[in-house]
Amino acid sequence: MPELPEVARTAISLNTRIQGSDLLEVKIHSGRYSRHGNPVGMDRFIENLPAKIESVDFHGKLVIFTFNDSNDKRWWMWNTFGMSGGWKSEKSKHGHVELVTTNGSYFYTDIRNFGTIKFVDDEKATKAKIKSKGPDHLKDNNTDELFAQRIR
């Protein structure tokens, strides 16, 4: 299972590579989304491609892609890695979802198919999702005192 530092490193690496580029296409190759339908919100999202990739960030183990679509509307893609997920720049047997960008393609791989992807155009829902994950131990100012308060 990818741990917090691995998720953070992946988000930072993706942000370095694709921030500011255009997302041209989202392709489903295999896995849960090929069998059970596209990720929630994807059909509406892809209607307005290309979309500018504003950022790739993380909060805990949640990876958050922020886009600005061709109609100047903001979208977010929420991604969790599950037990075996991650992003690669080369297609592999388990490269289930492909993001085609002006800086190349990036593949979401997930051998066990426990990870999730969801497209959302609601900033309040995105903020609520982030808040529901609790403090981010790599970003938030976490002290021993705050930790003790949270567990009381």
Where are these regions (language model features)?
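Extended, highly charged segments
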Residues: 1-59, 63-74, 90, 97-102, ...
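Phosphate/anion-contacting hairpin/loop surfaces
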Residues: 72-152
